[in-house]
Amino acid sequence: MDVQICRGVKVKKYRGIIPGDKEKNQMTSKHYKYFQPNDKDKKDDQSDCVIRALCKVMNKSWLEVFDELLPFARELQCMPNSKPCYETFLLNHGFVYQEISNKKGIKLPTVDSFTKDHKDGVYVLRLAHHIIASVDCYYYDTWDSGDCCVYGYWKK
């Protein structure tokens, strides 16, 4: 079990089946699909959400995306999974960013509701401390982040 920030609150992030909790085990969204392109990360604990999301939207392997991020990271002198690096990468690959207003009184969409409303297309969703891919009515991650708020997205 890990802790994840969701809607500004720390929540417990369970991996796989929750022992003794049949209700939670059956609560996975129908729009969620498990996605782990990193063959070396058997426990889903590498904190490589940026690379995983880019693998899905670019239809490339984990190593291909990692290698393509390195020149941007070197140029910007930052880590490959840092915001300046992946933003530059996405812009260079034709993605356009759309901020979602989080003004007082405006409810942010959840990953699940965003995916339902954006049935067609390729998106990279920005959550609190997390990035995921949304492609043609499904969101892809190593855990079901459907209840987390979307703060912005890149669309191809």
Segment roles from a protein language model:
Residues D141-K156:
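Noncatalytic regulatory segments and standalone regulatory/sensor domains
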